[in-house]
Amino acid sequence: MGVTLNIIGGLAVSQLAFMAFFFALYHRRHLIGRLLALYAFCLICHVLTYLPATHVNGLAQQVFYRCAALAPAVLWLVSRYLFVDNAKVPRWIWALIVSYMGLRTYGSLTIGNAPGFTTAYALTYVIPQFVMLGFSAHAILMAFQGLSSDLVEP
C-alpha cells in the first residue's frame, strides 16, 4: 500500500508542480497568477503530508502541515478575486487567517499528535478547523453567487 500511495502522491505532486510553475512563470505579474501558484503549492504540501516518505523529518512535516492548513484561506482569496468585483480583503480576514494559523501551529507544537479532547485541543484544533471549513464553504458560495452575474450566456 505504501508504494502505491507514494506513486500516486508523486504523480499528484508532479501535476500540481507543473501548475504552480506555469502560473508562477507566465502569470506572476497578475495577482491571480500568484494566488493560483500559492494554492497549488499549498495542495502540494497537503499531498506530501500523507506520503510515508515525508514522515521522517519532523521539521519538514510541520512546514507541510502549516502550508496545507493555509489552502482554504488561499482558495477563499482566489474565489474573492474572481467573483467579487473590486473587492478588498478586510483587515479582520487577515487577522482571522493569522489567528487560525497561529493556533494550529501552537497546538501542533504543544499538544502534538495524540491529544485528548481538552479545552486546549478545542482552541488549537477544533476552532481552526471550523474556520478553514468556513473559508472553503464561503469560497464555494461566492462561486455560485458569481454564476448569476456572469457575462457568459449558458
Region spans (language model):
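N-terminal low-complexity or simple alpha-helical regulatory segments
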Residues: 1-123, 128-132, 139-153
